[in-house]
Amino acid sequence: MPKCPKCDKEVYFAERVTSLGKDWHRPCLKCEKCGKTLTSGGHAEHEGKPYCNHPCYSAMFGPKGFGRGGAESHTFK
């Protein structure tokens, strides 16, 4: 029986969500920063931990500076 990477308890088939190559309990698959409940495949990963794509992952690990990587973040010289 697989164990949830968050709570380390057994994950039964009826409550299983597979993401990041592991089986999670649905309530355990949350963003590490804001705590938002995530869906399988609807999030980003950093060092094996799930993060919501926006704003948490992009703010923490995306390009830094004004606009965080959007069209307005390029500086012309």
UniProtKB/Swiss-Prot annotation:
Residues the record lists as Omega-N-methylarginine modifications: 68
Positions carrying N6-acetyllysine: 9, 22
Function: Seems to have a role in zinc absorption and may function as an intracellular zinc transport protein.
A single Gene Ontology CC term: cytoplasm
GO molecular function: peptide binding; zinc ion binding
Gene3D superfamilies associated with the record: Cysteine Rich Protein
Keywords recorded for this protein, A-Z: Acetylation, LIM domain, Metal-binding, Methylation, Zinc
Domain of life: Eukaryota
Presence of keyword Zinc: yes
Annotated GO biological process: cellular response to antibiotic; cellular response to UV-B; immune response; intrinsic apoptotic signaling pathway in response to DNA damage; prostate gland stromal morphogenesis; regulation of gene expression; response to zinc ion
Domain LIM zinc-binding: 2-63
Matches recorded under PANTHER family: CYSTEINE-RICH PROTEIN 1, CYSTEINE-RICH PROTEIN CRIP FAMILY MEMBER
UniProt entry tagged with the keyword Metal-binding: yes
Protein name: Cysteine-rich protein 1
Organism: Rattus norvegicus
